[in-house]
Amino acid sequence: MAFEGVLQIVATLVLMVAIVPFFGTYMARVFQGESTWLDRVLGPIENLVYRLGGVRPELTMDWWSYARAVLASNAAMFVPVFAVLLLQGSLPLNPNGISGMSWDLALHTAISFLTNTNQQHYSGETGASHLAQMVCFQFLMFTSAATGLAVGIAFIRGLLGKPLGNFYVDLTRSVSRILMPISIAFAVVLLSQGVPQSLGGTTEAQLVDPYRTEQDGKREQVTAQKLVSGPFASMESIKELGENGGGSYGINSAHPYENPNPFTNLLEILLLLAVPTSLIYTFGVLANNKKQGWVLFGTIFVLFVGLVGVAALGEYWGNPTVNALLGSANPNFEGQEVRFGWAQSALFATATTGTMTGAVNAMHDSLTPLAGLVTLFNLCLQVIWGGQGTGIAYILVFLIIAVFLTGLMVGRTPEIFGRKLEKREVALASIIFLVHPVIILVPTAIALAIPGLAGNSNPGFHGLTQVVYEYASAAANNGSGFEGLGDATPWWNLSTSVVLLLGRYAPIVALLALAGGLQRKQPVPETPGTLRTDTVLFGSVTAGTILILGALTFFPVFALGPIAEWIANLAGKTL
């Protein structure tokens, strides 16, 4: 069992690495405006979009214009989506008669999908009509992912001293050249594997083996099951590729209609890893230094493999208390699908939280403490591949901090890619770094301090982790959750909405300001004393910076939550 599980993980990682140089090179060609095989088909369509939108693609933007374009376009997308969610009960394409959302739930849901988070305080199959799934969610899954991609590419350009580009062009090309073609192709593959794509309503299937239930002293013979279908294959592909994570069903990719078998599970893992891993290589191509890209990739890959190993060990060892009751050692199968098993569940959990996707093929609330620690660790760092576009930007921010600290140690003015790092750059990098812990820890403290707000279903260490995880997921724009939490309340809807907005747009504005400042700086000629960032040694320094600054910031939370729970489990206690 152990060998088979390890083999599954290794095979998936090998395929992931094999994709990186090809997809990374393709994305570099797209964002440099070079010719691709899609030009003949998509070129005229893109030009039509520019004309209809009044966009002049040859014009470049400064950082403030780019930021305003991001904020204005996202605000314009929010309004109709919010309206549809409120009124979906009165709108067409609602065969199951789903009523409109309450204003606080609609607000949270619209903001959640707008920010590429897809945190769901409702159950997918019973909370949203087909119209909402298509017009609201799938639309925002493309545009929010494209927004992140555009910001990430603009940041790379500024860091390298190039013009930031035009947001509307980057947004359009992200959708037309990257997200849309791949999503269509994989939607067809998922459709062939049994994922539904339909506008029909709920159907009723007769059970082959009826069973009896008893509730409140009443016995009932169950002979049929309701099956919900909808436009789900098209949603599933962009859900993973765009690092969105919002599910058509309440249990997300654990549902057999979203993720029917091990083959689709492999495809979904590769899809959610494809963009953030390949963007690191894209950075190397744009910097004319592929070695730099591979060093950064290797740095994050080593951290990722280590975290996968910890999560897999935790799931393979299982729960000591349960194993003691059974009298044998067994992997953890609580909250998991037997068609995937412990290895693929651990890998999926690590990948989905590392990439800020948020889709799940097992319930994170049921993970062992070690695997739960890994998922929370990923959300708190945001750089173990990271979000769509923003992930590479955060990695480069840690690179900037590492260069600054190294420069201080050797007594030189730090510089990166031929640009000096001065007070403004370090201040902006610090803001980007500090926003995350503040918007996680402050609302967590409020929720835990005021009786009745937290809504956690577990006492003790695990209950603390449930609350912290919800805010960390919102702040990181991930969207997964420890779903034992009672989060369908006005407090959770409104407080996480604020965290979602701050976690998305405050760093984006700061990233663009940092990129704009570096882009304006005069280049500094390279000398024999210039610190090289494309070496394995400096990759190790960057990894150390990530672990020291990122992990230690949240260590008290880790210690009071999953680490304490793990120690208690080893001692045979359940709290």
UniProtKB/Swiss-Prot annotation:
The portions of this protein that span the membrane are: 3-23, 69-89, 136-156, 178-198, 266-286, 293-313, 340-360, 367-387, 391-411, 431-451, 498-518, 543-563
Q: How does it sit in the membrane?
A: Multi-pass membrane protein
Subcellular location, record wording: Cell inner membrane
Pfam families linked to this entry: KdpA
InterPro entries assigned: ATPase_P-typ_TM_dom_sf, KdpA
Does the keyword section mention Nucleotide-binding? no
Give this protein's Gene Ontology molecular function annotations: P-type potassium transmembrane transporter activity; potassium ion binding
Q: Does the keyword Transport apply?
A: yes
UniProt keyword list: Cell inner membrane, Cell membrane, Ion transport, Membrane, Potassium, Potassium transport, Transmembrane, Transmembrane helix, Transport
- Could you give one GO CC term from the UniProt record? plasma membrane
PANTHER family for this protein: POTASSIUM-TRANSPORTING ATPASE A CHAIN (PTHR30607), POTASSIUM-TRANSPORTING ATPASE POTASSIUM-BINDING SUBUNIT (PTHR30607:SF2)
Q: Give a short account of what the protein does.
A: Part of the high-affinity ATP-driven potassium transport (or Kdp) system, which catalyzes the hydrolysis of ATP coupled with the electrogenic transport of potassium into the cytoplasm. This subunit binds the periplasmic potassium ions and delivers the ions to the membrane domain of KdpB through an intramembrane tunnel.
- Summary of subunit composition and partner proteins: The system is composed of three essential subunits: KdpA, KdpB and KdpC.
List the protein's name: Potassium-transporting ATPase potassium-binding subunit
Q: Which species is listed as the source?
A: Gloeobacter violaceus (strain ATCC 29082 / PCC 7421)
